[in-house]
């Protein structure tokens, strides 16, 4: 075997081991987030019944929010799709808790509501020094409140997690093209305006 061939084989072997190590490290890094997501999903199971959510002070904003995919300079970019009907719990405060989202999101299905996602809203304050994060995901924002359901003066960050409905745009995308907002309570929103503050 020539020296050049031995060198080539050694390089390939080293590269293979490096890639394998990287894959193992990456898989290990993702495991805690998967475990957290599984725990979150289990904790949220009871809220598949929206009446239980209401009893726990998650109150409906009624409108089924969806977006056209319109892009407006200086505003958030939302892919065409829907979020759904938001149930907001104003009693949950403080730093975002991965097991206690302060928003539950439901999709109208016939005469019922199906829990599809959860969301964390974090107010932007004078003390905010960095973008909040959960599950290795940085929150979107800061942005104004989502009018007309939330006053525009409520500047905040948010993060969605589609834990009960597959989202082709990704688990943490804000909109989901598979969610339908039809009927009397469909609410087409314009992209939310971004505001000054620590960004992604």
Identify the meaning behind each predicted range.
Residues 30-200:
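Primary mode marks residue(s) on the alpha4-beta5-alpha5 output face of response regulator receiver
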């Amino acid at each position: 075997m020539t020296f050049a061939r031995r060198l080539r084989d050694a390089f390939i072997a080293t590269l293979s081991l490096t890639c394998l190590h990287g894959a193992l490290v990456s898989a290990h890094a993702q495991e805690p987030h998967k475990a957290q997501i599984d725990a979150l999903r289990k904790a949220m199971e009871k809220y598949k019944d929206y009446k239980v959510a209401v009893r726990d002070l998650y109150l409906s904003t009624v409108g089924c929010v969806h977006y056209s995919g319109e892009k407006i300079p200086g505003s958030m970019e939302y892919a065409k799709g829907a979020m759904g009907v938001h149930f907001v719990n104003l009693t949950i405060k403080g730093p975002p808790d991965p097991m206690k989202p302060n928003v539950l999101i439901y999709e109208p299905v016939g005469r019922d509501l199906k829990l599809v996602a959860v969301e964390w809203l974090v107010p932007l304050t004078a003390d905010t020094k960095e973008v909040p994060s959960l599950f290795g995901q940085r929150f979107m924002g800061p942005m104004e409140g989502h009018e007309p359901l939330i006053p525009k003066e409520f500047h905040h960050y948010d993060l969605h997690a589609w834990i009960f409905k597959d989202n082709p745009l990704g688990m943490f995308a804000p909109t989901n093209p598979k969610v339908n907002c039809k009927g009397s309570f469909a609410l087409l929103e314009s992209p939310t305006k971004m505001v000054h503050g620590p960004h992604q």
